[in-house]
Amino acid sequence: MTIFEKSVTGRTGYTLPEEKKDEIRPSDYIPEHLLRKELPGLPECSEIDVVRHYTELTRKNYSVDNGFYPLGSCTMKYNPKLNEKIAALEGFSLLHPYEPIEKVQGALEVMYRLQTLLSEITGMDAFTLQPAAGAHGELTGMLIVKKYFEVKGENQRTKVIVPDSAHGTNPASASMAGFQVVEIKSNDNGIIDLDNLEAALDESVAAIMLTNPNTLGLFEKDIIKIAEMAHKNGTLLYYDGANLNAIMGKVRPGDMGFDIVHLNLHKTFSTPHGMGGPGSGPVGVKGHLKEFLPIPVVDLTDEGYILKTDLSHSIGRIRSFYGNFGVVVKALAYILMLGKDGLTYASEIAVLNANYLRTRLSELIPTAYPGLCKHEFVLDGTKLVKEYGIKTLDLAKRMLDYGVHPPTIYFPLIVHEALMIEPTETENKDNLDHFVEVVKKILEEAKKDPEFVKNAPYNTPIKRLDEVTASRKPKVRWIPKEQ
């Protein structure tokens, strides 16, 4: 039941002093034309009803605090609770964005220090912390690309090259910025085919969007050559930082030749994510693009920290105020807590865990591409259909009954029946071994009775959804019964 369905007319969870009721007149504070004419359709519940309702929902929810969460390309690592305490300090949590600059110098220092550290980690020259999510960062980067070529007078550059192994939001972000997306095929080893890239490069190409390692978990070993090809053509090279967790302290996007980078603080730098946010997708650029960053940017002068707005070619604001500040605080705390050596070690263990799990699982389900991976890997689930009579979806649904969150499935699209698995560095060997045992048990079940696995899950509040009806007759908002 929803909280609305538990509503009982007249039931409340609070009372106001009788003598104060007549003193509180909304019209004293809110213009008449903005006052509601009718009561809002809010649920009427007692405090204990509300507490019990949401406590029950938490029992039905699943998070990295509950167990293994191996969603590929999502980096569902554990989020240190110390970071939450730091972000909740009153000096941070009670700030208001309209406070005078001289009174929020500490907050600006946090932002400036994070910008500086992210530049050092990625090899960029400047950063903005405004974007509220990864895809928002992508759009920001693409708008910078667009403005850059407008200023140069190269308006013929209307295309963005995206490999078929790209992170899912790349083509959408490029399209939203007004570019035509050109997809190029990967080669048999799962990385960019240089011949295909060369054939696609011409004076109409504004940028190439890449993730490295790519979404298959494979490092684009020809990245230096790709950067040379792009820059020789006058094309910018864009780095999707979704998979930065694999290479921290080992190699920097800026050193590979990338001009623009977006990061996901809610992934790589261990701030909570899922259920829509809050996230943070900072964008970094090389020196020749600094003047195109959105305003304002935090800068340090002899008088203190300022919000700089006089960038000559800025794309303008891309979000209200200054980004999701609480996420920024948590990310800075995480980086300072680990330090350079700690971040490097985190990437090393992330890659080690992925390769250990890949090696063990490949004995049950073949990998899509052979050889070592980075932070994640993709299994080819066509064997499930041929030998066990089940699909990747069935395996994923049955995992729920064992208390394990399924990996990403059916992505990337270039692998049929794909399972994309990213264990992250915060899981121990016992948890990885348990996951392997769960997969083994499910395959044994499928061998004996495929239909049993096909009808899973059995232990969850919601069973199999009618996906056909859901797609053809979607209900995306709550409607009161009387309507």
Swiss-Prot record:
Top-level taxonomic group: Bacteria
GO CC term (a single one): cytosol
Biological process annotations from GO: glycine decarboxylation via glycine cleavage system
An MF annotation (GO) of this entry: glycine dehydrogenase (decarboxylating) activity
EC numbers for this chain: 1.4.4.2
Keyword Oxidoreductase: yes
Residues modified to N6-(pyridoxal phosphate)lysine: 267
Cofactor: pyridoxal 5'-phosphate
Catalysed reactions, semicolon-separated: N(6)-[(R)-lipoyl]-L-lysyl-[glycine-cleavage complex H protein] + glycine + H(+) = N(6)-[(R)-S(8)-aminomethyldihydrolipoyl]-L-lysyl-[glycine-cleavage complex H protein] + CO2
UniProt keyword terms in alphabetical order: Oxidoreductase, Pyridoxal phosphate
CDD domains for the chain: GDC-P
Signal peptide: none
InterPro entries, alphabetized: GcvPB (IPR023012), GDC-P_C (IPR049316), GDC-P_N (IPR049315), GDC_P (IPR020581), PyrdxlP-dep_Trfase (IPR015424), PyrdxlP-dep_Trfase_major (IPR015421), PyrdxlP-dep_Trfase_small (IPR015422)
HAMAP family, per the entry: GcvPB
Similarity-based family: Belongs to the GcvP family. C-terminal subunit subfamily.
Function: The glycine cleavage system catalyzes the degradation of glycine. The P protein binds the alpha-amino group of glycine through its pyridoxal phosphate cofactor; CO(2) is released and the remaining methylamine moiety is then transferred to the lipoamide cofactor of the H protein.
The protein's assembly and partners: The glycine cleavage system is composed of four proteins: P, T, L and H. In this organism, the P 'protein' is a heterodimer of two subunits.
Name of the featured protein: Probable glycine dehydrogenase (decarboxylating) subunit 2
Encoding gene per record: gcvPB
